[in-house]
From Swiss-Prot:
Assembly: Homodimer.
Active site as annotated: S151, D321, H354
Pfam families to which the protein is assigned, alphabetical: Abhydrolase_1
Protein function: Transfers a succinyl group from succinyl-CoA to L-homoserine, forming succinyl-L-homoserine.
The EC number(s) this enzyme carries: 2.3.1.46
Annotated organism of origin: Burkholderia ambifaria (strain MC40-6)
Entry protein name: Homoserine O-succinyltransferase
C-alpha cells in the first residue's frame, strides 16, 4: 500500500488562555498539527489520533526535506491502510509540553523572555484533551467519528470519551490502561531521577548553559525501552550474543564496556533518544502518565467513572505486553459492559510486548481495518 506521501505540519495559535488542572494558566499558546485526507461536507469523517510519550503530530507520511522522516504510525494511516485517508480526515496534534513545536518547556516564557524550562506548568492528560478540543473547534468539527490512540494515546482517547461524551462516536483504545500501577509509576520515577541527577540538568534551565542532560535522558530511555519489549522478544533478538568492539564473538572481555548485543542496542536507543528529545518534556509527560486516573474522583470505581460515556468502543491489548498487560484493558471492558456500552475487545497474540501497537501485525491491522470499515459505513465515508 502506498504512503500518503509528502506532508507538512501547520501551527495553530490560540489566544484564549487555557486553565490547567493544576490551576496554572497558559495564555497565547500554539499547537502543531498535521492532517491527512479530506474533511467531508458534513464534517463527519474526522478521526483524531493521539500520540504516546515520545511521538508527535507526525503520524504518517514523510517531510520533503527528509525522506527518512516517516510518521510514527505510517503503517496504519494512509491511502488503503486500516485508517484509510481516502475515506477519513485524520488529525495528529502535538501536545502541550512537548518538544516538537507546540508550546512547552523550550518555548519562550513571555514574562521573562527566556525559555520556560522547569517553570513550564505540569500538564495532565485532561489538559491535553481540552487543548485538542480547541483544535477540533478550529476545524469546525463538532463530533469525531473516532478518537484513537495507543499507550498514553489510548489514555487520551478514553479521556475524550469521558470529558466530551457527545463529541466522540467511537473510542479506539489500544495497549492502554485505566491508570498506572505502582510498578509503572516506579519505572517513571527511576527514569526521572536519572534526568534530575544529571549534572547538566541545572534545575531544568540547561538551555541557558548550552548543554543537555544527555546522560540522564539516555538512562531514562534505556529503562523505558526495556519495558516496551517482551522477554521472549528480547531473547529472540539478542539472547546472550556478544557484541565486542574488537569483534570477538566467543570470549568475555572482563570489563564494563559493552559486551552483549542487548547492551549495544540499549545504548544505541538511549543515544538516539537523547539527541532529539527534551529532558523537561520527558519529566512532564511521565508525570502526566502517573496522574491519569479517571476513577480517582469516584473512590476508585471505574464503572462509575464511565457511567456517562456515549461512545462505542474498541479496546485492544497484546498478549506479551507487560507494561500495560491485557488484564488492564479488560478492566476498562468490564466497566463499560457494566454500563451497558457497546464494546469490542481483542487480545492479540503477538510476541513484541508493549511496542506491538506500533508494528505491522496482520491480525491487529485486520481488526482495525474491519472496525474502521464499520465506522465509514456509519458516517458515509
Amino acid at each position: 500500500m502506498e504512503s500518503i506521501g509528502i506532508v507538512a505540519p501547520q501551527t495553530m495559535h490560540f489566544a484564549e488562555p487555557l486553565r490547567l488542572q493544576s490551576g496554572s494558566v497558559i495564555g497565547n499558546y500554539q499547537l502543531v498539527v498535521e492532517t491527512y485526507g479530506e474533511l467531508n461536507a458534513a464534517r463527519s469523517n474526522a478521526v483524531l489520533v493521539c500520540h504516546a510519550l515520545n511521538a508527535s503530530h507526525h503520524v504518517a507520511g514523510v517531510y520533503a526535506d527528509d525522506p527518512r522522516s516517516t510518521g510514527w504510525w505510517d503503517n496504519l494511516v494512509g491511502p488503503g491502510k486500516p485508517l484509510d485517508t481516502n475515506r477519513f480526515f485524520v488529525i495528529g496534534v502535538n501536545n502541550l509540553g512537548s518538544c516538537f513545536g507546540s508550546t512547552g518547556p523550550m518555548s519562550i516564557d513571555p514574562s521573562s523572555g527566556k525559555p520556560y524550562g522547569a517553570r513550564f506548568p505540569v500538564v495532565t492528560v485532561e489538559d491535553w484533551v481540552h487543548a485538542q478540543a480547541r483544535v477540533a473547534d478550529a476545524f469546525g468539527i463538532e463530533r469525531f467519528a473516532a478518537v484513537m490512540g495507543g499507550s498514553l494515546g489510548g489514555m487520551q482517547a478514553l479521556a475524550w470519551s469521558l470529558m466530551y461524551p457527545e463529541r466522540v462516536a467511537h473510542c479506539i483504545d489500544i495497549a492502554s490502561t485505566p491508570k498506572l500501577s505502582a510498578q509503572n509509576i516506579a519505572f517513571n520515577e527511576v527514569a526521572r531521577s536519572a534526568i534530575l541527577s544529571d549534572p547538566d540538568f541545572h534545575g531544568g534551565d540547561y538551555y541557558a548553559h548550552g548543554v543537555k542532560p544527555k546522560r540522564g535522558l539516555r538512562v531514562a530511555r534505556m529503562i523505558g525501552h526495556i519495558t516496551y519489549l517482551s522477554d521472549d522478544d528480547m531473547a529472540e533478538k539478542f539472547g546472550r550474543a556478544l557484541r565486542r568492539a574488537d569483534g570477538a564473538l566467543d570470549a568475555y572481555n572482563f570489563s564494563f564496556d559493552v559486551e552483549f548485543e542487548v547492551e549495544s542496542y540499549l545504548r544505541y536507543q538511549g543515544d538516539k533518544f537523547a539527541d532529539y528529545f527534551d529532558a523537561n518534556t520527558y519529566l512532564l509527560i511521565t508525570r502526566a502518565l502517573d496522574y491519569f486516573d479517571p476513577a480517582k474522583a469516584f473512590d476508585g470505581n471505574l464503572t462509575a467513572a464511565l457511567a456517562h460515556t456515549q461512545a462505542k468502543y474498541l479496546i485492544a491489548s497484546f498478549s506479551t505486553d507487560w507494561r500495560f498487560a491485557p488484564a488492564r484493558s479488560r478492566e476498562i471492558v468490564k466497566a463499560l459492559l457494566d454500563n451497558k456500552r457497546t464494546v469490542s475487545y481483542a487480545e492479540i497474540d503477538a510476541p513484541h510486548g508493549h511496542d506491538a501497537f506500533l508494528l505491522d501485525d496482520a491480525r491487529y491491522h485486520n481488526l482495525l481495518r474491519a472496525y474502521y470499515e464499520r465506522i465509514a459505513n456509519e458516517v458515509g465515508a
